[in-house]
Swiss-Prot record:
GO MF annotation list: aminopeptidase activity; metallopeptidase activity; zinc ion binding
Official protein name in the record: Probable M18 family aminopeptidase 2
SUPFAM superfamilies, per the entry: Aminopeptidase/glucanase lid domain, Zn-dependent exopeptidases
Key words of the record: Aminopeptidase, Hydrolase, Metal-binding, Metalloprotease, Protease, Zinc
Residues binding Zn(2+), per UniProt: 84, 157, 397
């Protein structure tokens, strides 16, 4: 059994504070895979040769699938855990910068469904990827420029409706002020040492500058940006690298969940099904043997859960509410907004009981619509039995969300048991 030290919150915080975007997160995971397993990268546009060992595949820099294979156990089922790498936010329009009233302000495009008001009056960083030309070749660099700007509120004296449900106009009211001296694009290129004529494109998103913090009188909670769903990504990664390689375990990190997953690097693509099939092709399994194997496999989809808010208890079903500090949550929906079935729930609950892991169940109130996640999409795409779980949080899609450290540890323990023992 792995030492309890690997469950310490500082490792969780390291991922949160060093992964402001999916690009950074995938790089972070890649480094861990190489450090722990000397994992070998495979590419989708090349032939695969697989022997016993650890491998990973990246898709467009923001999605990744890692797998461990023992060729002697090539007929055994896949044990899959999946999460998403993206979070709601404000993407920079790199060439939509204006200078008004002596300051440069930068227009954005809203990604996903953030709680807009939480972005106001916060120290903002800018992170992502920049592509440029060098010696006629296309190169790229990841950036994370801290404290680059702010979206200031209008003073209450000039906006008396600010505390009465004021609605922010995304184009006019969410402009990020960055400087009085130079445009943000010029600042970025200067820091990277790139001439303007060599700039090609970028994918940049504003994030909070403040690092994650352990909070509360007893140090029970962790507040951070991007907990949805970097908490799920960390739980999978921690479990994957700290369990034995006796099983055919697979860690999946999809992008673009927050905008529907319908991209080549999202759950609503052939990425996972293609990787699973190509693994078995490389292992000389027949098509029928591959289908038999996938029908024996199991997928745990982990994403954030709405924790019951003490100030808004009427929003939750009192019999099916998710309490912070009371363990992993199984997500259920009559309309299959989540992939959980009674069969899958029974299997997971049995695994949890055998390993003394606390679990709870959430079903939304009948008059409150349920969200959804990658579970049902991945389930339909692969046909693999899937269950949706997660850890409860407050203020989902806020710039700063809050989770229970104890719940996160329980999620890691559950995934470790799954990777070690199956289901």
């Amino acid at each position: 059994m792995v030492x309890x030290k690997t469950l310490e919150p500082k490792f969780f915080q390291s991922l949160l504070d060093n992964s402001p975007t999916p690009y950074h997160l995938v790089n972070y995971i890649e480094e861990k895979l190489i450090n722990y397993f000397n994992a070998q990268q495979l590419k989708l546009n090349e032939k695969w040769k697989i022997k016993t060992g650890s491998y990973y595949i990246k898709k467009e820099g923001t999605s990744l699938i890692a797998f461990n294979i023992d060729v002697k156990k090539k007929y055994e089922p896949f044990l899959i855990a999946a999460a998403h790498t993206d979070s709601p936010g404000l993407k920079l329009k790199i060439d939509a910068t204006e200078k008004v009233s002596g300051v440069f302000y930068n227009h954005i495009e809203v990604y996903g469904s953030p709680i807009i008001s939480t972005w106001i009056d916060r120290d903002l960083s800018l992170a992502g990827i920049v592509y440029f030309k060098k010696n006629e070749n296309i190169e790229s660099k990841l950036i994370n420029i801290e404290n680059i700007g702010i979206i200031p509120n209008l003073a209450i004296h000039l906006n008396r409706q600010i505390n009465e449900g004021f609605k922010y106009n995304a184009h006019d009211n969410l402009t990020v002020i960055s400087s009085t001296k130079k445009a943000i694009k010029d600042n970025i290129l200067e820091q990277l040492g790139i001439e303007c004529e060599n700039f090609l494109s970028c994918d940049l998103i504003f994030t909070e500058s403040q690092p994650s913090k352990i909070i509360g009188t007893e140090g029970e909670f962790l507040a951070s940006k991007n907990l949805d769903n970097k908490s799920g990504c960390h739980a999978i990664m921690n479990s994957y690298v700290h369990t034995s390689n006796d099983k055919n375990k697979i860690a999946v990190f999809f992008d673009n969940e927050e905008v529907g997953s319908l991209t080549s690097r999202g759950a609503d693509s052939n990425f996972l099904s293609e990787v699973l099939e190509r693994i078995d092709i490389a292992l000389d399994l027949t098509r029928e043997e591959h289908l038999i194997k996938t029908n024996k496999s199991f997928n745990i989809s982990i994403d954030s859960v709405h924790g019951i808010h003490p100030g808004y208890t009427s929003k939750h079903d009192p019999n099916y509410q998710a309490n912070l500090g009371k363990g992993v949550v199984v997500k259920n929906s009559a309309n299959f907004r989540y992939a959980t079935t009674s069969t899958g729930f029974a299997k997971l609950k049995n695994l949890a009981i055998k390993n003394n892991i606390k679990i709870q169940e959430i079903i939304m109130k009948a008059n409150v619509p349920s969200g959804t996640t990658i579970g049902p999409i991945s389930n339909a795409r692969t046909g693999i039995e899937t269950i949706d779980i997660g850890t409860p949080m407050w203020a989902m899609h806020s710039l700063r969300e809050t989770v229970s450290i104890a719940d996160h540890i329980e999620a890691i323990k559950l995934l470790r048991a799954f990777f070690e023992k199956g289901i």
